Amino acid sequence: VSAADKALYCQGCFHCWVKTPGECSYKDRLQKIGSRLAQCEEIVLLSRCCYGAFSPEVKRVLDRSIAVSLPFFTYRGGEIHHMLRYKNHPKMTVCFYGEITDFEKKTAQDIAERNCVNYGFQNLRLYFAEEAAGVKEVLFA
């Protein structure tokens, strides 16, 4: 899934949890992103690092992916999290690129770790590259 293509922002209506379970009510290319992610073996996120976080485009895709969870809560790792809708738990690889300070790297690491837990992904691998062109070398070194 490319975050570069235009897609609507999550409106926070939670229809994907209760009205149209597992599907966003927006009828665009991200409508079934939750179930599509659940079918993957590995999720690879490539993002420009924006103040220690995902770019707005990648964040939009992540926000629209909340259908991977349910509106109910459970304990995981001693914390309360939403229950997961799907049994498959893909691996997660994140590569941030750009001029990134040490503080931004720490923030990006924290965000990636929390997203990994919240979305039910596993085995986080985190990389940093100076520019987008360097991502390939970092991921396939």
Named regions from a protein language model:
Residues 70-118, 122:
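Short, glycine-/small-residue-rich phosphate/pyrophosphate-handling segment
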Residues 1-47, 51-70, 117, 125-141:
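N-terminal beta1-alpha1-beta2 submodule of the flavodoxin-like/Rossmannoid cofactor-binding fold
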